[in-house]
């Protein structure tokens, strides 16, 4: 069983948990207390010198960065390639969505909400505009689409649903974006591990209360 270092409130950690559920892999979950500095202990730095979560250790093989872990789990343990198809064009679209999630959508969340939550900084209206812009892009990607990349559930949907659900508990109005809202309501029903994802979201929500 693979060791999985995580926090339940973390969106990237939740995307890995849902992917593992989708491919039927059980994770040996190890909570890492970042506030206590557990990620900076020598034993963890040996595993991941970048000292980030999520981190997976599968039979001695250590990997971090959630989207890399998602792809690894599907390629190693998936009974089919449906979550990350081998077709170069299908895979390219999935990769684009994953990079969009990492570099644009979730980054906009971090830039706007993290300073407020962790540094008690005032809200930055310019950073909020970046969130709105990211959702407008996602809304366009999802025009006429039931799924984020192709005609079935993929790791792109799983990564994006982890992010979008985090926006929801932060109080962002997803319903303003009709295509995103429709996709999200469906994703809640069809994504394996959604319940655990939502429980983690509610943990994260405590930072906003």
From Swiss-Prot:
Domain GST C-terminal: 87-209
Binding residues for glutathione: 10, 51-53, 65-67
Manganese listed as a keyword: no
EC numbers for this chain: 2.5.1.18, 4.5.1.1
Signal sequence extent: none
Reactions catalysed, as given in the entry: RX + glutathione = an S-substituted glutathione + a halide anion + H(+); 1,1,1-trichloro-2,2-bis(4-chlorophenyl)ethane = 1,1-dichloro-2,2-bis(4-chlorophenyl)ethylene + chloride + H(+)
Gene Ontology BP, a term: glutathione metabolic process
Subunit structure as annotated in this protein's UniProt entry: Homodimer.
Family label: Belongs to the GST superfamily. Theta family.
Protein name: Glutathione S-transferase 1-1
Provenance organism: Drosophila sechellia (Fruit fly)
